[in-house]
């Protein structure tokens, strides 16, 4: 064969193939873990923080119980199954925009964007979004998913006569024509902020750089003048530093969350509230609560007062998303010198309002300024705690005797009696069981779930609810069941509880059954953003073999 013909054959048979570029709208990895959702609050006592260190620039889509899309507003730390949740700092694109770049921020230690990276986003024809997510440089960071409000067939949104959905202020209609996505006000004129704009759910806020604070208009910033101006706003000591200044407290007091006010230490527990007042602050005063029979006891360094939510004149109220217990510690001069040698006083009266906050869904002290006149010295003591419930399995329909040592082995035709019981019985409060579901394992985020109660509604017609004398207790009966499969011989129950005020006719508890779409558990405006706690009971062994 001639050389020219051989070369011609070689050139006609060797072809170069162009690499196939796949559309990320059809080539993506699904993220469907329930703990990714913004409703999932991380509890370090129950699990370890998670991290997305396995990601390496692939395309992802949020599906299932993880949510519909990434949140475009700041997510508080300790959500989405980790310490530092990652959110999208920018609006989602339109379908015609193609692939766009957005900043993703991790929230931690009060900073909505302590860490950031760049991700790519694309709006797909099916009304959903895909994301090209980078591997976080440090742990513990997780990319969050979120369920956005939708206009459903029952018109829980604002539906127009044209069957189109009108979204609430701060949101806009997504490409699917029914989902209301959060608007990022910071993308328009920086939200009106002179320096830093932080996008929040349905709103935004302005912030300032180091050494600067917001003016009263909430938009512009001014320099912090330091300790020489009004003591820097510190209730006690003000120390200058290169970055500005910092406040410090005398021994026995602690700095409050505002980083300016020194507080009396207070420990909030459902069983007792403990206030510890430094002896130097008390001097020759005698401390007592609203009920004057409840008095402080000195241990040499502190005067301690311990009381419960039901004693010593404690007042319990429901305020927004919290249960608030309050009392007042009053200090008056002793009639005679005490055994500790107090023979002088430096103030004529001491007032310490004590406040403990507990989350509704299953939470400290201001300055000591010497005052020698007759005006009372006031210190605020404030802290957070947990208002606990237990999920009990009972022996019969009287709901008086729960299984304690060992849980029962039941047959499929038996009745299962279970209930939510408060560890502390407080009048003026009531509860709503927002959801109860069963799993074959003790894991709350188990993929295989069977709902008995959902959105405050009974979702299984065989579930029967019993009345209870205590507004906080809830009792139920359901026929025994098991999960399909010979290996599934146990059943675990998990319930979420919300606490409200009995007299609040507009509360989520008063509304009762409230169906929502695409939610793991019913969430009304009244309970949005509340701290959640899931109660777990079991295992219940099933004797199913005939």
From Swiss-Prot:
Organism for this UniProt entry: Rattus norvegicus
Glycosylation sites: 89, 116, 299
Signal peptide: 1-16
Job description of the protein: May be involved in hepatocellular function and development.
Residues of the EGF-like domain: 182-222
Key words, A-Z: Calcium, Disulfide bond, EGF-like domain, Glycoprotein, Nucleus, Signal
GN (gene name): Oit3
GO MF term list: calcium ion binding
Subcellular location: Nucleus envelope
Domain of life assignment: Eukaryota
GO biological process: renal system process
Stated name of the protein: Oncoprotein-induced transcript 3 protein
Chief location bin: nucleus
Alphabetized SUPFAM superfamilies for the sequence: EGF/Laminin
Residue span of region Disordered: 524-546
């Amino acid at each position: 064969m001639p050389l020219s013909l051989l070369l011609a054959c070689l050139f006609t048979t060797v072809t170069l193939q162009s690499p196939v570029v796949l559309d990320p709208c059809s080539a993506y990895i699904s993220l469907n873990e329930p703990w990714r959702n913004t409703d999932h609050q991380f509890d370090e006592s129950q699990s370890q923080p998670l991290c997305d260190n396995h990601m390496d620039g692939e395309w992802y889509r949020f599906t299932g119980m993880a949510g519909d899309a990434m949140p475009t507003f700041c997510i508080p730390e300790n959500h989405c199954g980790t310490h530092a949740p990652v959110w999208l700092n920018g609006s989602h694109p339109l379908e015609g925009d193609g692939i766009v770049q957005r900043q993703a921020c991790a929230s931690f230690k009060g900073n909505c964007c302590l860490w950031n990276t760049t991700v790519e986003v694309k709006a797909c024809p099916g009304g959903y979004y895909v994301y090209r997510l980078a591997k976080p440089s440090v742990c513990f960071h997780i990319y969050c998913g979120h369920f956005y409000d939708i206009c459903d067939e029952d018109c829980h949104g604002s539906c127009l006569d044209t069957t189109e959905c009108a979204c609430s202020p701060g949101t806009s209609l997504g490409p699917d024509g029914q989902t209301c996505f959060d608007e990022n006000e910071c993308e328009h004129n920086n939200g009106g902020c002179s320096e830093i704009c932080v996008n929040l759910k349905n709103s935004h806020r302005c912030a300032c750089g180091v050494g600067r604070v917001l003016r009263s208009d909430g938009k512009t910033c001014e320099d912090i003048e330091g300790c020489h101006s009004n003591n820097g706003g510190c209730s006690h000591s003000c120390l200058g530093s290169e970055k500005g200044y910092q406040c410090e407290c005398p021994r026995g007091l602690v700095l409050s969350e505002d980083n300016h006010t020194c507080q009396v230490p207070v420990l909030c527990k459902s069983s007792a509230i403990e206030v510890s007042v430094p002896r130097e602050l008390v001097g020759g005063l005698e401390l007592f609560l609203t009920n004057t029979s409840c008095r402080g006891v000195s241990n040499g360094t502190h005067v301690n007062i311990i009381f419960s939510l039901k004693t010593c004149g404690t007042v319990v109220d429901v305020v927004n998303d919290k249960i608030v217990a309050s009392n007042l510690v009053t200090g008056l001069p002793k009639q005679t010198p005490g055994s500790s040698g107090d023979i002088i006083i430096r103030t004529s009266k001491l007032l310490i309002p004590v406040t403990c906050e507990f989350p509704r869904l299953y939470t400290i002290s201001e300055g000591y300024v010497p005052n020698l006149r007759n005006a009372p010295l006031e210190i605020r003591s404030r802290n957070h705690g947990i208002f606990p419930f237990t999920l009990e399995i009972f022996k019969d329909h009287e709901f008086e005797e729960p299984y304690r040592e060992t849980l029962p082995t039941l047959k499929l035709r038996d009745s299962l009696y279970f209930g939510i019981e408060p560890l502390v019985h407080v009048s003026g409060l009531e509860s709503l069981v927002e959801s109860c579901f069963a799993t074959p394992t003790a894991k709350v985020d188990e993929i295989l779930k069977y709902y008995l109660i959902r959105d405050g509604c009974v979702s299984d017609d065989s579930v029967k609810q019993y009345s209870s004398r205590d507004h906080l207790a809830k009792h139920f009966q359901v026929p025994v069941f098991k999960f399909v499969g010979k290996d599934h011989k146990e059943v675990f129950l998990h319930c979420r509880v919300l606490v409200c005020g009995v007299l609040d006719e507009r509360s989520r508890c008063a509304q009762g059954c409230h169906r929502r779409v695409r939610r793991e558990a019913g969430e009304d405006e009244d309970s949005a953003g509340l701290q959640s706690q899931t109660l777990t009971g079991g295992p219940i062994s099933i004797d199913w073999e005939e």
